[in-house]
């Protein structure tokens, strides 16, 4: 088929007898100018009639026409929701050229052809180990496909390492507890007990070391205690209880003049576009009424008249604005009054008032706006609102979505706005004299587009299924001045929903080729949208920044799942390619993180919006820390990855960890608590050439299974058994037991028999792993924290010297049952089967391994 035949025939620009708005809405038009319907809906400026046949297309083509097999759209889908905007009175030649280029891009994106191998479905399994569900005292969670837990559960190397780590920590806790060294902090969760206990034991060791008594130790002790106290205070403040009768609004709020001049001015200028769910004129009116009736007169906050919801909205806006200034790292002389406001009890006050209403039964506009502000605060705040893996956000988000649907905030406010018939009662707040039906439609549109995008966003971040199950196909218009960035993103919603459906309809059978096509379409169409927003470039950069990072994060998580599938499937060529692609993606994302922290001016992100952008950067950087150990543990399987290359990977892990925890660990509770396991993972992997970490892990867990079978395991009868927690080790044990009295090296069994992809030589495919040393260099030469306290490596010199002594002694010991290979890649194929050790000897042996890796001295302040 020739190119000319592929181009869509342009329609004639016919003269219309009704205005273009009514034609698109399919509503009645009285044919006046402006028509009555447009006057009623506030679309006066865009009420136009076509009177010539200029040959221009009647409407811009849909971004979603790339799918040639899609069904005929319904009338609702043919409507252009939310994009009937004010038309400029005239356009310059430059603008006409710009829109011509946009049309060309759209036509190209809707008519491209794919290679036949990309059109053919190719299915992969993203849940080879099943879904990951965790139950505990306070919550039950099914983790999304791309959360840390799900990634670790999918990857046999990470799953085994995490299991080993948890058992080792438990054994060390039991050992320290037997000495009466357990430490508890009532304001911190039970999961912090191990952190506090390790830390207290380390302080006892170091306080006895004369060498370490000095400024460094005192500085460490001060910083460490302040962090524990700060995060304990977070939880204590958020758990505070109030009595409605004793709450006086004036005790928490600044004077109205300061609120308007500093807080609301900052909110409207810098933050409102992030959460555009208000009509600011109406909001200011409600705040003024609240101050007049409650603050100035000293009246109690009325729940009946919904004063408490206005109060909560004010509290949340103040707290969000304060976060904006706090994380901007600007001089304290900017917004000084705002920084002096004590917001520590605000979240507890909001939660108190929210549950004074029937929040689980019915909802009004103020209450919904309060819930959305709370959701936004959970996302941005340093407290642990969403959970360490965003696993606690769905319940609040589900409440918001259900409330929206109950209130009529849905796709209809875009597709059929003229069909809304309001009855506004006299006691409604905001009242009818300040908020008319057209204002409701406008606010409804803002809220729905915002809630919709956040629902789709969480699918890309954690892989969880979208809660909003409907989408409409939206079209570009020739004007870029849509009310909000979120409304503009409606043109991408159909693609984002398709990606969600492809991923979550059957995670065990995901069409990878279709997913790649959809992601490429999303990137291309998002690029077009960015070109349309050229007039708002200054105020929208943080949104575009976040969207780009979200797409990168999704691609990273998908690549990891793809690599695991090829590994299980023994697809050698594709496994090697995905292994390299995943590593390249890790390096690329790490570079972006580095630039965010140390070259932020080049990113052109407003410093007052960093409290918002920090969150996506923190999630992405953490994902790198989760995935990098998977490369290090697999390194021995590749002929082209030498021990020196593994050391570079470990140095890279150390560099990324240092940046992540030094930039976020001091402020964010969720990052602080991850430091413990991250430090242990680093200690596990940072082994000498003679001490292969993967061999240690496998032997340890096989011994633990033997102890479990003999009834001598440390595991309490209420705990799950190792064979249930990590079934792959039980399967591996069965494979090892096939060798009766004579067996190969344990790594040979794993690589060649149990996990057979390892038996294929790199020479068979010509694979040569590219380390990308040049791109890693910033993290290998980690000097950013050499002149100040490095929270990740505190007292690391002392710990390293202790570890070096152990290594030196172990290296000089004559090994009779196992010969040490010259390099990790050269494995012994056969060796005598070592006799089984007595149970007591096994326990001693295990503690030797644990103490070698987890010497408490290594965890001064690493909890």
UniProtKB/Swiss-Prot annotation:
CDD domains, sorted: GAL4
GO terms under biological process: positive regulation of transcription by RNA polymerase II
Bilayer-spanning residue ranges: none
GO CC, any one term: nucleus
Its job: Transcriptional inhibitor with a significantly increased number of target genes in response to oleate.
Highest taxon in the source lineage: Eukaryota
Compartments where located: Cytoplasm; Nucleus; Mitochondrion
UniProt-listed Pfam families: Zn_clus (PF00172)
Example GO molecular function: RNA polymerase II cis-regulatory region sequence-specific DNA binding
Keywords: Cytoplasm, DNA-binding, Metal-binding, Mitochondrion, Nucleus, Repressor, Transcription, Transcription regulation, Zinc
Signal sequence extent: none
Family per record: Belongs to the OAF3 family.
Residue numbers spanned by region Disordered: 52-99
Bias (Polar residues) ranges: 52-63
Protein name listed in UniProt: Oleate activated transcription factor 3
